[in-house]
Amino acid sequence: LLQMFSFCPCSSHADTDRFTWDLRQEDMDLDDLSRQLQDARDSLQPLSSSPVLRYLQGRPEEAESILSQSEEKIRECYGEKSDLRLIVMYGDLAWLKYHRGDYTQSQNYYKRVQDFQHPTGSPAVLHPEVYGEKAWTFLKFSVSYHHKAIDCFCRALELQPDASEWNKGYTIALYRTEPDSPATKQLSRALDLDPDDGFLLALLALKLAAHHKHQEAKSLVERALLLSPDDPQVICHVGRYLRQQGQLDRSIDLLQRVLRRSSRSHFIHHQLALCYRKKKLNLFTRRQSTVAQRGLD
């Protein structure tokens, strides 16, 4: 019993649970994060990130409940590769059980982490799935963590250079932090590995349009709409592209349609507001031009 109470997962496997990754509440907007996770509810990312959000919101019981329900969904998604995908989840449960006083279960989960934690036997090397999970968490939780996300995706790619998931994550992180060529180059690589990813297609279209490659950008946008017509994240970026190209009515129609499915999406509301603002400015400019022309007449 004494040995059980002296065990503390926060010091023994800090690289494999989110609660020890220095995710500070002051660095993030919890309400906005909650909306983002709701928008992405069809993917596994909310499943992995929601427990930390619930804990930061002062709801540890919900955090533990979500984690306890996660294993089956992860196994359904990843099949025989799910053990490596479960390392961080088991680490989260070990930490949470310990801090809620369930030392026996905490140690059981910690032992599961130990079974898979280091692929080479070296404590300096983790599985790419752990680096990837850490990177996605940093990318999702706060803009101030995006450079940490880049570092973690790079570590995952060192071990699995052709993994489409790590290339996609690295692409998104670069897109949000690098202004020009590095992100564009990585977007192209990620799409070579996963050519049917509507989100990446929309991101690359925005980059190409910024470099005046309008025909190629337009083609990518239409393909993104064909592949992901109801994905709020894809439509948000497509709507942004259309607004920048002056297609305000089409942008508004798409954004309003997807808004009916994700009514709390901050990003879609923001893009709609920008569209209406631009329409108002266009109307004002036309009126000013008409008044000026009448003055000349």
Language-model segment annotations:
Residues L1-D297:
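Non-TPR docking regions that flank or precede TPR/alpha-solenoid scaffolds in eukaryotic proteins
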